[in-house]
A protein has these predicted regions:
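Short glycine/proline-rich turn/loop motifs
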Residues: 2-5, 35-41
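Acidic (Asp/Glu)-rich catalytic clusters
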Residues: 16-35, 52, 91-92
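Active-site beta->alpha N-cap acidic-glycine motif
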Residues: 1-28, 64, 71
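C-terminal active-site subregion of NodB/CE4 polysaccharide deacetylases
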Residues: 37, 44-128
Length: 128
């Protein structure tokens, strides 16, 4: 690809948020939350310690950008996947509200398991 003049960094710059974008979002009143560090698609298959590391590194990164006193209280489960260890880890990190990626009913759900519809589900439902 490089021999054709394609720079991977140029596509990264166009696709992904940078630290400045995150500051802009916060300054506009948006709430930033955790989503993991490496976005494991089956985070619920990781050990409790691996899950804690995923979310703790994500939290540390956000605080390093936003300032150490920044409150990060929200999160969204990667691919809607989680288990009891995940919920315990998140509570231990001070996370108060979490979102799943579908609207299915979860009996006895907590504030860390709120339903929301993922855009991929919506696109699939309307046939785009």
């Amino acid at each position: 690809m490089s021999h054709k003049g394609f720079r991977v960094q140029s596509i990264n710059d166009a696709l992904w948020l940078n630290d400045g974008h995150l500051h802009d979002l916060v300054n506009q009143g948006h709430v930033l939350g955790l989503h993991s560090t490496t976005h494991p698609t089956v985070i619920d298959n990781l050990s409790r310690e691996q899950q804690r590391e995923e979310y703790e590194r994500n939290l540390d990164y956000l605080k390093s950008i936003l300032g150490g006193n920044a409150e990060v209280k929200a999160m969204s489960h990667p691919c809607g996947r989680y288990n009891a260890d995940t919920l315990s880890v998140l509570r231990g990190l001070g996370i108060e509200i979490g979102f799943r990626s579908n609207m299915s009913h979860v009996e006895g759900r907590s504030l860390l398991e709120l339903p929301r519809e993922d855009h991929a589900n919506i696109v699939r439902k309307i046939g785009i």
